[in-house]
Each structure stands twice: as structure tokens, then as C-alpha cells.
């Protein structure tokens, strides 16, 4: 950040007002994405992003987040503090303007912030509007100021309450339970975002403290993040369990046409592309022009180097852009003065000029790296050739999947017991472990809207398999065909084509034992790597069959955990010395059709767990660790999470 920008005065005059706040409570999803878990956590990100803006401007080094015991959130920073002087146009404190007017903030005054992710004032005023209670405290100019709000309305004027030798802003808010589906914060979700921010902003101290939970030492559970390595460290974290084929992470940063570009990348022995893109610290899940620019620059530069070095002379088929990205893990971070995001939740960058800026930056810096590191360059090109060879084989296998799919009209898998309903939004398919359990499920289901596809044994571990092996696997081919999806769209020959998807509920149903959990994980890994769009759209679920059946005469009750079993046994005994029959279900096949319907299939009674991806970064890391080749990280993960496991006696 330039000294000119760093020293720019940040006062009430810098706060610009664009529009009012009335619409936020009426249509919250327009501003924070949704009113579920994602939107709830988005409130925290908006407040934290304001503190990050201060850090980007060179005025903040510590940001601390607290989940309080009542599920309210406190975010503190040691930045300059939101201005409290009288706003000339509004005639009231700039702090009140920032907290109560949408699009009011220093972000819109280029002198205050060169770039900004969280829209300073937009985010925090949205948070205020969607909170039942909010309190802001500002330490600035040797004084402490405060103001409190209820559903966005000030309860009194900004007031001075003391003196201080610190600077910073402290915000505490409680999400409005009348707006959000639930108001319980998830420590792991917030932790993943703060870790991400620490990598993207090296040298900044971030912490998360959960005042609802005490650790083994009697202290509040706390996570602290600071990264000195930045994006290089981020890529190593993402790639922790994969085998790198290069001797170090490739890193470069620079600026082109006023767009600062930072890239860290490495190639590994896996077969998947794992690229994460950010604009002003915002995770752009859907990519955008910066990602397009990166891919264009990468492909063009590697292709030119490979052609000039003569390494492609013996390759008899065309190499595609995808081949240059197989086994690539990369993080791209750009800073854009006036970002144009497609969609209110900022997930796709639309600035056309960024494509050329990023493409040129990547080309220039990667060309230099390849010339300076010929041995590493040759390893990358050999990886590309291997990817192209495998893709050629995979294309034939994919074509088999497409030919066998419902789109070609050649029929559905013989093992599929389909439903009669044809509206996908009303249909559900159960992927059932084994033929015997599949038989029970077929008898117990509602044939009108429930389909059953039995899967034989453990499906292929796609994390360790080349693409053509995946598409040649019989069980996987059956899943593609039964679901009605295929590979390849007009825009991308490798993209999932969901135009003919036949079910909007895809339910994984396996035994409630270790083997069943392993099979469910294999299926989830397949969905994450090859049908991720179904997960992102909320179409993938996990069934929860009961673990126990308790019997006392004609009284029969099901329970889903050991704790629930113990409570029910005590309740059914009623203080008397009577025997309670306990049946442990180790497999779905041990239940008859009626029991399976009552507990697991009946929409009125069952519990389905929807599979979601709160953090693509964390999901990728966990799948790679659980299903990859490295044993020590997997063992450490299992030991750390052993308390959540169900162990069969």
C-alpha cells in the first residue's frame, strides 16, 4: 500500500452515502445470499472484511472474533476506528451513518481505501439491519464512543463514554431469530474463513474464540492464525497430503494495468485441478475474469515453452487446455479498484479488463520461471503429456458413459428400480449398499416417487484413479446412467451436463457400521470430484437409518445413538427391574421392509442429512487426506476425530 494512501486522512468527510436501508429486512437474501447457515455466517464475514480493509490500508494488525455464550458475535480490531465526527451532508455522526445507511462507507471514497472486499458500511449496515441487537464501540482520538441499535435503529445518539490510548472498532451483534432459519454459529466454518484470510493477508494476526466451549485445560476453545508465507503457505496447506512433483511452490506477484496479481502454484501427482481464486480477499467460487486470465496465461506460456523446447514432437494427438491443469494446485489473488461482481454474494468477477491484466502477468512471470528452472519445466511438460494421453483414453470411456446414458435412449441400468413419477423435483433415488439391502429397500419404498439403485461392494476410490479408469468402472457408469447426467456441455467437454437430471434428491444409504461409513465416503468423494454441481445445488443427501430397536412388550422404539439408547432404556424401565430387548442394526438388510420405511424412507418420519460444502478449500483438503496415499495425516485426522466415530463392538 503506498505511503500516500496509508497517510490519507480517514474522517467523517470520507464517508459517502448512496442509498437507504429499508429493503434489507424485506429481502435479506439479496444482500447476504440466503437466510440459512451460509447467510448467518456471511454476517460475520462482512464485519471481519471491514477490519481487513483497514489492514489492507496498512492500519490494522490484529483482528479477533468471539462467539459469545448466547451465540452473539463480537469482532474487534486495532484499526483507526470508524469516524465519529458529524457527517456534513447527513448532519449526524459518521459512525451512525455507517451503521444505519446502506452503501455508506469509506470504501466509496478512493482516498480512504485503495481496494476493498467487504464494502465498508454496506456490510456492517446490513449486519445491523439483520440483528436484533448490535453495539458498536470506537476507540479513536483518545476517546471511547458507543452506540446501540435494535433491528438497525439507533437507541440513542453516538456518545462518548471514556478515554483510551488505543484505536480500533469493536462490534457485537446478535442475529435476528425472526429472520434466520437458525442462529447457532459453527466454529469450524468461521475458523476455515479466518485461516483463509490469514493466508491471503500475510502478517496479520487473526483469532477465533468460542465462549460456548471449554477445552481440556479449562479455557475457551480458541484458534489463532498468522501466516508469514502467504499464498505459498496456502498452497502447501491445500496440497499437504498430495505428492508434489516440483521441488518448491512456484510463486510470483506483480502489477499490470493497475491490477496487482499474486499467484502461488504447484503440480502434484494427482489427476484433479484444484484452483482457488480471490478478489480483494473475497473467495470467488464461480471464478470470473481473473480465473480466465490465469488459465489463458498458463496454457499459452506452457504451450509455447513446450513447443520451443521440442518436447511435444512425439505427441500424436492434440493437447488441450485442460491437460495443462491436471494435478495443478493454485491460488490466484488479485486486487481490483472497482470490482464488478455478478450476483449479490460476490462469487464471480465480471471486470473484462482483469482478464488481460492477469493473463499478461502470468505469462511474463511464468515464462521467466520456466527459463530459469529448465529441469522443473521439463517435469511440468511431461506431466502435461501424461495428462493428454490419459485424457485421450478417458474420452473413449466418457463416450461410453454418454452412449449408455438416458440421453441416448438405450435404457437404464438393469439393477435400477425406478419410480413412476417423471418430475425430477418430486423424485428421489437411493444409492444402496449391496443387493440384499437393495432388495429390502425396493420392497419398503414408495414406488411412486422413490427409486433404488443397489451398488455392489465398495465403489472405486476416484482420488487414486486416473480418469479413464473412473469412467470404465461399472458402478460409476450405472450412477451416471441412472441419474440421467452425462459428461460434456457446449462450453466444456469435461463439465457435468445436468440438463436431463432425473432426481432432485440423491440419497446415499449405507449400513450403520465402519464398512458402511467407508462406502459412503467413497461415494461422497466421487460426487465431490465428478458431480460437484449436484452437491452445490443441494441435491445430495445421506440417509440416517437407526442403530437400535428397543422392545418392551408391544412398545417398540428406535434410536440413533448410544446416548439416545441409554436414555430410552431408562425411560422404558420406569424405575422397575424389567428386561428391555435391544437389537443392534449392523446392516440395512437386518431391517424388514416396513421397518426400513418407518425409519429411513418415509418423508414424514425420516431424517436426511443434506451434504453441503461450507468451504471448498477445507472439503478438498479433507477428501484428499482421507482418500489419498499419505497415511500419517489420515491417522492424525482419525485420532483427532475419534470421539465422533461409532465403533462396532
What role is predicted for each listed range?
Residues 87-88, 95:
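Short adenine-binding "F-helix/F-box" segment of the Bergerat
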Residues 26-45:
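Conserved short strand/loop->alpha-helix "switch" segment adjacent to the catalytic nucleotide/phosphoryl-transfer site
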Residues 88, 342-354, 558-564, 568:
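Helical (often loop-to-helix) elements that flank the catalytic cores of nucleotide-handling enzymes
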Amino acid at each position: 500500500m503506498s505511503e500516500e494512501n496509508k497517510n490519507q486522512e480517514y474522517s467523517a468527510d470520507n464517508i459517502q452515502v448512496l442509498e437507504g436501508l429499508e429493503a434489507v429486512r424485506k429481502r435479506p437474501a439479496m444482500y447476504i445470499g440466503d437466510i440459512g447457515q451460509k447467510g448467518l455466517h456471511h454476517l460475520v464475514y462482512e464485519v471481519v472484511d471491514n477490519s481487513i480493509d483497514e489492514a489492507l490500508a496498512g492500519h490494522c494488525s490484529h483482528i479477533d472474533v468471539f462467539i459469545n455464550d448466547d451465540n452473539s458475535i463480537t469482532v474487534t480490531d486495532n484499526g483507526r476506528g470508524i469516524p465519529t465526527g458529524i457527517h456534513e451532508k447527513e448532519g449526524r455522526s459518521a459512525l451512525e451513518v455507517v451503521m444505519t445507511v446502506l452503501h455508506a462507507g469509506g470504501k466509496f471514497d478512493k482516498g480512504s481505501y485503495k481496494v476493498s472486499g467487504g464494502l465498508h458500511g454496506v456490510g456492517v449496515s446490513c449486519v445491523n439491519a439483520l440483528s436484533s441487537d448490535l453495539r458498536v464501540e470506537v476507540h479513536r482520538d483518545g476517546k471511547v464512543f458507543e452506540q446501540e441499535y435494535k433491528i438497525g435503529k439507533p437507541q440513542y445518539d453516538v456518545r462518548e463514554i471514556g478515554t483510551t490510548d488505543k484505536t480500533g472498532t469493536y462490534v457485537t451483534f446478535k442475529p435476528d431469530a425472526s429472520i434466520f432459519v437458525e442462529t447457532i454459529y459453527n466454529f469450524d466454518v468461521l475458523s476455515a474463513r479466518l485461516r483463509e484470510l490469514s493466508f491471503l493477508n500475510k502478517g496479520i494476526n487473526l483469532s477465533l474464540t468460542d465462549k460456548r466451549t471449554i477445552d481440556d485445560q479449562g479455557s475457551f476453545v480458541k484458534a489463532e492464525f498468522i501466516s508469514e508465507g502467504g499464498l505459498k503457505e496456502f498452497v502447501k496447506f491445500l496440497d499437504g497430503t498430495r505428492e508434489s512433483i516440483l521441488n518448491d511452490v512456484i510463486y510470483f506477484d506483480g502489477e499490470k494495468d493497475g491490477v496487482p496479481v499474486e499467484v502461488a502454484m504447484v503440480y502434484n501427482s494427482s489427476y484433479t485441478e484444484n484452483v482457488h481464486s480471490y478478489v480483494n480477499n473475497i473467495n470467488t467460487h464461480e471464478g470470473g475474469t481473473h480465473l480466465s486470465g490465469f488459465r489463458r496465461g498458463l496454457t499459452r506460456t506452457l504451450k509455447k515453452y513446450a513447443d520451443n523446447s521440442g518436447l511435444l514432437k512425439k505427441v500424436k494427438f492434440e493437447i488441450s487446455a485442460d491437460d495443462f491443469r491436471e494435478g495443478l494446485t493454485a491460488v490466484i489473488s488479485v486486487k481490483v479498484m472497482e470490482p464488478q461482481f455478478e450476483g449479490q454474494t460476490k462469487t464471480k468477477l465480471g471486470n473484462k479488463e482483469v482478464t488481460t491484466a492477469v493473463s499478461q502477468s502470468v505469462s511474463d512471470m511464468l515464462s521467466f520461471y520456466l527459463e530459469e528452472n529448465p529441469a522443473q519445466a521439463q517435469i511440468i511438460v511431461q506431466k502435461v503429456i501424461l495428462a493428454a494421453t490419459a485424457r485421450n483414453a478417458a474420452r473413449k470411456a466418457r463416450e461410453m458413459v454418454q452412449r449408455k446414458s438416458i440421453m441416448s435412449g438405450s435404457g437404464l441400468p438393469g439393477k435400477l428400480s425406478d419410480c413412476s413419477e417423471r418430475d425430477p423435483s418430486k423424485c428421489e433415488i437411493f444409492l444402496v449398499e449391496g443387493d440384499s439391502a437393495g432388495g429390502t429397500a425396493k420392497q419398503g419404498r414408495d414406488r411412486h416417487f422413490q427409486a433404488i439403485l443397489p451398488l455392489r461392494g465398495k465403489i472405486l476410490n476416484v482420488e487414486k484413479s486416473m480418469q479413464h479408469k473412473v469412467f470404465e468402472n461399472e458402478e460409476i457408469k450405472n450412477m451416471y446412467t441412472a441419474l440421467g447426467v452425462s459428461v460434456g456441455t457446449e462450453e466444456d467437454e469435461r463439465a457435468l451436463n445436468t440438463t436431463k437430471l432425473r432426481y432432485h434428491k440423491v440419497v446415499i444409504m449405507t449400513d450403520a457400521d465402519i464398512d458402511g461409513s467407508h462406502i459412503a465416503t467413497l461415494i461422497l468423494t466421487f460426487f465431490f470430484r465428478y458431480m460437484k454441481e449436484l452437491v452445490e445445488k443441494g441435491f445430495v443427501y445421506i440417509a440416517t437409518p437407526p442403530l437400535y430397536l428397543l422392545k418392551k412388550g408391544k412398545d417398540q422404539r428406535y434410536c440413533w445413538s448410544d446416548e439416545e439408547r441409554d436414555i430410552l432404556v431408562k425411560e422404558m424401565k420406569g424405575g422397575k427391574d424389567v428386561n428391555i430387548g435391544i437389537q443392534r442394526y449392523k446392516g440395512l438388510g437386518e431391517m424388514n421392509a416396513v421397518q426400513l420405511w418407518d425409519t429411513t424412507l418415509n418423508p414424514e418420519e425420516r431424517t436426511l442429512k443434506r451434504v453441503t460444502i461450507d468451504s471448498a478449500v477445507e472439503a478438498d483438503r479433507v477428501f484428499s487426506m482421507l482418500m489419498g496415499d499419505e497415511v500419517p495425516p489420515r491417522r492424525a485426522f482419525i485420532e483427532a476425530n475419534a470421539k465422533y466415530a461409532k465403533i462396532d463392538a
